[in-house]
């Protein structure tokens, strides 16, 4: 949680940090888009009433209509200037130290289409999915490189934000690592149910103690040691839902060549890994077969490589690429094939 409350900067791009920021600046964390429970994406009417894509004169053109009620908390309108600022920041990962430019370098022009809230975006080449464009929208102030890097460090300023909550007066306590947000009286959308939310940074063991003592309302219990520890906490309810994420091992293509990466993917016993990871937990979902679509999506298809003999299939890939077995390991050009995987956790299970 913090200290950099800019989730687009590499130093603020942490999942828990972004979740806290989303309470008071949903425009920055989810942009013009929303998703339903099936994972289908559509324009968020609080910010955008139309977002279409079509080919015009051989070029992909996006037509965007912004909600005229939408404003940042300092009164700055959500209009073409905010989209231009977003394009400027997210197409330049050297100046602004963002994680990835995505499709933003493919934007050729951003023009008014009759008014400042009706915007025409022309792409230099067809780009998909369009929902990855303006899935973050920044206040024009964020184009200031110093402010982008340092302006929100230990200063979660909601003046440049737009969302159902705002940072409370003195809401960030950098010593105790707590952030409190309250209802935003400038919010034009649906009124939030809660009057305030307090986010608190705790290490994993401290979270469990705080939950057991009634200081926290919820805590993750996704490893067996935590689950067992919390089973007997009075009035605790265990709730299980679909995680909207399919993770995997990311291998550096500079250090691990394509044949070795392919061999690992074909030869890996994913079920054995899953059984080990979730042993002792009431979890029995099927292994995900796609890194693009969730199993409940209508577009889902299991695209993972299938082999009757994984070991033989992996060996064949390596040997066709010039690897040769030496003892228990494969080598190529005198170097042993290896991949180093680091896993960080505060829990020894």
Model regions and ranges:
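Ligand-binding "clamshell"
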Residues: 227-240
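Gly/Pro-rich hinge or "lid" segments in bacterial periplasmic/extracellular proteins
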Residues: 18-19, 26, 37-38, 135-191, ...
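Aromatic- and charge-enriched surface segment that lines or borders ligand/interaction sites
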Residues: 49-96, 120
């Amino acid at each position: 949680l913090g200290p950099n409350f800019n989730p687009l900067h590499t130093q603020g791009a942490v999942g828990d940090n972004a979740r806290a920021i989303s309470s008071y600046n949903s425009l920055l964390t989810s942009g013009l888009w929303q998703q339903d429970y099936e994972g289908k994406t559509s324009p968020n009417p609080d910010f955008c009433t139309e977002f279409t894509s079509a080919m015009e004169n051989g070029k992909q053109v996006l037509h965007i209509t912004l909600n005229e009620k939408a404003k940042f908390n300092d009164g700055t309108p959500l209009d073409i200037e905010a989209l231009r600022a977003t394009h400027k920041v997210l197409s330049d990962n050297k100046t602004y130290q963002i994680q990835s430019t995505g499709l933003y370098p493919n934007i050729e022009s951003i023009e008014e289409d009759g008014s400042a809230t009706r915007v025409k975006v022309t792409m230099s080449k067809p780009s998909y999915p369009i929902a990855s464009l303006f899935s973050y929208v920044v206040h024009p102030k964020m184009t200031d490189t110093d402010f982008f890097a340092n302006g929100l460090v230990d200063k979660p300023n909601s003046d440049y934000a737009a969302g159902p909550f705002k940072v409370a007066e003195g809401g960030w306590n950098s010593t105790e690592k707590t952030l409190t947000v309250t209802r935003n009286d400038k919010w034009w959308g649906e009124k939030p149910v809660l009057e305030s939310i307090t986010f608190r940074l705790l290490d994993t063991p401290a979270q469990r103690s705080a939950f057991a003592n009634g200081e926290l309302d919820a805590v993750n219990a996704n490893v067996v040691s935590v689950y067992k520890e919390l089973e007997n906490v009075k009035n605790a309810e265990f709730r299980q839902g679909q995680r909207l994420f399919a993770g995997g091992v990311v291998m550096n293509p500079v250090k691990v060549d394509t044949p070795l990466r392919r061999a690992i993917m074909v030869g890996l016993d994913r079920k054995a890994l899953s059984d080990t990871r979730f042993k002792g937990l009431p979890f029995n979902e099927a292994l995900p077969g796609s890194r693009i679509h969730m199993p409940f999506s209508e577009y889902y298809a299991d695209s993972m490589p299938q082999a009757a003999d994984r070991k033989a299939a992996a060996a064949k890939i390596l040997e066709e690429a010039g690897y040769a077995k030496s003892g228990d390991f494969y080598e190529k050009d005198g170097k042993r094939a290896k991949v180093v995987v680091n896993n960080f956790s505060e829990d020894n299970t």
